[in-house]
Amino acid sequence: MNRSVLISGCTGGGKSTLLAELAARGHAVVEEPGRRIVKQELEGGGAALPWVDMAAFARRAIEMAIADYASAREQTGWTFFDRGLIDAAAALQHLTGEPVLEKLSAAHRYHPRIFLTPPWPEIYTTDPERRHGSDEAVTEYDRLAAVYPTLGYDVVILPKIAVADRADFILDFLSRETRQQ
């Protein structure tokens, strides 16, 4: 059984907070590639930033997500990803037209259920690592919500509830699914 679970969706929708909750409960988590890249680039004066060179940023995110995916395969329990390979490949393909999405998705499959955080304007904020506005975040969300089913994933939209309840929702969903197999 594939235990690499992808949590994607709208920027500012509560993904990172949710992953922190899952980590606090003892689950393996993988931090969003984009945030790690932005931090590295800002510290080192690099240009692979989404507001400087989005294609270079997406390519770096793809490389990092592939490495993250390979590392997670060693885990025995659930591993939760804050975004991942598909998000980065979808961004690169949207920007450049380069047909990378299907090939990368086929080679690196996550759990068949993808959990998406919907737009949640009440909690959306910008910060030094997240500079785009909520309209861009919603456009990105709509694109991802359309992409995942075309790649054979079942999309589960997370409810707008407290972070502990969201974590319970995901864990209960996965537990029920595991019992049914």
What positions do the PLM features span?
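Hydrophobic anchor at the beta1->P-loop junction of P-loop NTPases
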Residues: 7
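P-loop (Walker A) phosphate-binding loop of NTP-binding proteins
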Residues: 10, 22
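Conserved glycine(s) of the Walker
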Residues: 14
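Conserved substrate/cofactor phosphate-moiety recognition/catalytic segment
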Residues: 23-64
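Glycine-rich phosphate-binding loop used to anchor ATP phosphates in small-molecule kinases
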Residues: 58-109, 124
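A glycine- and Lys/Arg-enriched "phosphate-lid" helix/loop adjacent to the NTP-binding pocket
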Residues: 96-162
